UniProtKB/Swiss-Prot annotation:
Keyword terms: Cytoplasm, Exonuclease, Hydrolase, Nuclease, RNA-binding
InterPro entries xrefs: CSD (IPR011129), NA-bd_OB-fold (IPR012340), RNase_B_OB_dom (IPR013223), RNase_II (IPR011804), RNase_II/R (IPR001900), RNase_II/RNase_R (IPR004476), RNR_Ribonuclease (IPR050180), S1_domain (IPR003029)
Name of protein: Exoribonuclease 2
Gene this chain is encoded by: rnb
Alphabetized Gene3D superfamilies for the sequence: 2.40.50.640, Nucleic acid-binding proteins
């Protein structure tokens, strides 16, 4: 009767046309209901509709209104939250396999089976990789997954490492050693083994890729400058282009430095032995001769040579720093030659620091946090380490070497792996200017500062450096921390471009080829120039992979650290330990505070800061929270936080500001 009825079809079209569709992301709550987060609005998702979705799903939904209430009815799936995911195993009362997703907001328990390639017998709590196979909105079936990889047992103390590496699809083993390694030299090697090269590194370092020799340049008896000879390990001499080792290095891109151990980019036989500039061993190297005047200005062109070198001493950062800082009972150089090298390199470093202060930008000292681990992977202690003078000596030598490499490649190869940074994201230039003016200007200087911080000026190397130097003495941290949010990301490029973060017009690293694939590429380009060959333009695919690998490695480091911090602080909850902190972020949900002593991040919910929500206002442009119209908390602010809760299953650390 109703089949092919034009009136009915018209009615259906009218009903469909009158529906209000929205698209957004599902946000689960601690209860059975949830919310659909759209661009400018949030909609209530009732419990029955939440059964069709999970936290993070991107969906299309229909808005339903009843009286003055709005909610949505899920229509279709746009993109599932899960595809490949990490989970822990559990078994229900019928001994059926289920998966608990390793995500703080996903509460769904997902039934699963096991792929035939997984041969381990799974037990409750084991960590696995799984693939979502069916979704209620997409497949008209309940959620279902398949275990595709076993990671580790539930009681494995090194689960933070293995689970995190699996999550980011990173290898946990070094590249396998080859049966043998042969030198493939096209360039004649100069014998520089008589030069008194030294290395300065951490005592535990095995993969030493830089050694230094320095001497004064004199005209008669008068010193006019410095000659720095930078010897860098030469792994490309052992690794033919397009070999399996080259392909493995290209995929990994970096040595992964994790708490407790590293996963090298190259086989350990190369990284820790044949290529490492160990003391009293003859090693192949790519060497750069750099000359400066006494003020640290680079004079003339850098000369690169292929060479044999021999490090005469392996020195430790803290020992050298203690000696130069004249710490009581400090270590002393074991020979007159070592002492001379340290003293000369120290003088050169002071000149280069001053040069960069006036002509580029210096790093702000913030300290690095390192985990001291027991053999079983538990955290014994966490240390904060600051860059001392010996660290700066190596840092300044590597920076000038990389500046010279970039100029050499730009002039001769017309390509390279260049490290670049454009400063402020173009879309944030006017916002950055407004923030600077709102923070720093007065009625008297507003016109002058408006011109000084003009967007078109902030976009240039010179203007950006002038801006950074102008705020160096500003007493509160929030200014610099807020400006960081307006910056764009550093990028690898095949054409030379400025690095505004360093305040330098050209920069290309070549000083860590054992640890960085981009440095290996630059070594090959330098050698092509020295051989008189036409340098091949660096492929875009290499730059993309470098960018991706750098991001992955940072996420791995962060995720492992979050897990170790949770383990470390968990026993302190009962003692209600209090920490001196600095506010690292303010968001709509609360405040995130960094513990000064160990670097842990503690979340402080807004609900604990003030009991009247209507009197609280979050201002994202300032990264600040206002209470009753007064600024109460802002990024960079010093606060004291009491630890109240650590949730090991989600690695979340919670506290109260006191």
């Amino acid at each position: 009767m109703f089949q092919n009825n034009p009136l009915l079809a018209q009615l259906k079209q009218q009903i469909e046309a009158n529906k209000e569709y929205v698209e957004g992301t599902v946000k689960a709550s601690d209860k059975a209901f949830g919310f659909l987060e759209c661009d400018k609005k949030s909609y209530f998702i009732p419990p029955m509709e939440m059964k069709k979705v999970m936290h993070g799903d991107k969906v299309k939904a229909v808005v339903k209104r009843e009286d003055d209430k709005e909610q949505v009815e899920i229509d279709s799936l746009l993109e599932p939250m899960l595809d490949r995911f990490i989970a822990q195993v559990r078994f229900n009362k019928d001994n059926k396999l289920q998966l608990i997703v390793d995500h703080p907001s996903i509460k769904n328990i997902i039934p699963a089976n096991t792929h035939k390639k997984v041969t381990e017998t799974l037990e409750s709590g084991d960590w696995v990789v799984a693939q979502l196979k069916t979704h209620p909105l997409r497949d008209d079936r309940f959620l279902f997954a398949q275990v595709t990889q076993f990671i580790c047992k539930a009681d494995d103390n090194f689960a933070p490492w293995w689970v995190t590496l699996a999550r980011h699809e990173q290898p946990r083993e070094p590249v396998a050693n080859e049966k043998s390694y042969e030198l493939h030299d096209e360039l004649d090697r100069e014998d520089l083994t008589s030069l008194y090269f030294t290395t300065i590194d951490s005592p535990s370092t095995q993969d030493m890729d830089d050694a230094l020799y320095i001497e004064p340049i004199k005209q008669g008896e008068v010193q006019t400058g410095w000659r720095l000879v930078v010897a860098i390990a030469d792994p490309t001499a052992y690794i033919p282009e397009n070999s399996n080792l080259e392909k493995a290095a290209r995929q990994r891109c970096f040595t992964n430095y994790l708490p407790g151990f590293n996963i090298p980019m190259l086989p350990r036989e190369l990284s820790d032995d044949l290529c490492s500039l160990v003391p009293n061993k003859k090693r192949p190297a790519l060497v750069g001769y750099i000359e400066t005047d006494l003020a640290g200005n680079i004079t003339g062109d850098t000369r690169f040579v292929s060479a044999w070198v021999e490090s005469k001493a392996k020195l430790a950062y803290d020992n050298v720093s203690d000696y130069l800082e004249q710490v009581e009972n400090a270590w002393q150089p074991e020979s007159a030659e070592t002492k001379q090298q340290i003293d000369w390199l120290h003088q050169f470093t002071l000149a280069r620091i001053e040069w960069r202060r006036n002509n580029a930008l210096l790093f702000k000292e913030s300290g690095d946090y390192s985990f001291e681990l027991n053999e079983d992977g538990s955290v014994r202690d966490i240390h904060v380490e600051y860059r001392r003078i010996a660290n700066q000596m190596i840092e300044e030598s590597m920076i000038i070497a990389n500046i010279c490499c970039a100029k050499f490649l730009a002039d001769n190869a017309k390509t390279g792996v260049f490290n670049t940074h454009a400063g402020f994201d173009p879309k944030n230039l006017e916002l950055a200017q407004k923030f600077l003016l709102d923070t720093l200007s007065t009625d008297e200087n507003r016109d002058a500062l408006t011109a000084f911080y003009a967007p078109e000026k902030l976009a240039t190397l010179e203007g950006y450096c002038e801006m950074r130097r102008s705020i160096d003495e500003f007493p509160e941290k929030f200014l610099e921390l807020r400006l960081r949010r307006y910056l764009t990301f550093a990028e690898f490029k095949s054409e030379v471009a400025p690095h505004l973060g360093l305040g330098i017009s050209h920069y290309a690293t070549w000083t860590s080829p054992i640890r960085k694939y981009g440095d290996m590429v630059n070594h090959r380009l330098i050698k092509q120039v020295l051989l008189g060959k036409q340098a091949k333009t660096v492929e875009e695919g290499i730059l993309v992979r470098l960018q991706e690998a750098r991001r992955q490695n940072r996420l791995v480091e962060r995720d492992i650290a979050d897990w170790l911090y949770a383990r470390y602080l968990f026993p302190m909850v009962e003692q209600a330990v209090e920490f001196d902190c600095e506010i690292a972020d303010v968001s709509r949900g609360g405040v995130r505070a960094k513990v000064i002593a160990n670097g842990a991040q503690i979340f402080v919910p807004f609900s604990t800061l003030h009991d009247k929500k209507e009197e609280m206002e979050f201002r994202p442009e300032e990264i600040a929270l206002y209470i009753k119209g007064e600024k109460a908390y802002q990024i960079g602010q010093a606060v004291k936080v009491k630890l109240t809760e650590v949730r090991l299953e989600t690695r979340s650390i919670v506290g109260n500001i006191i």
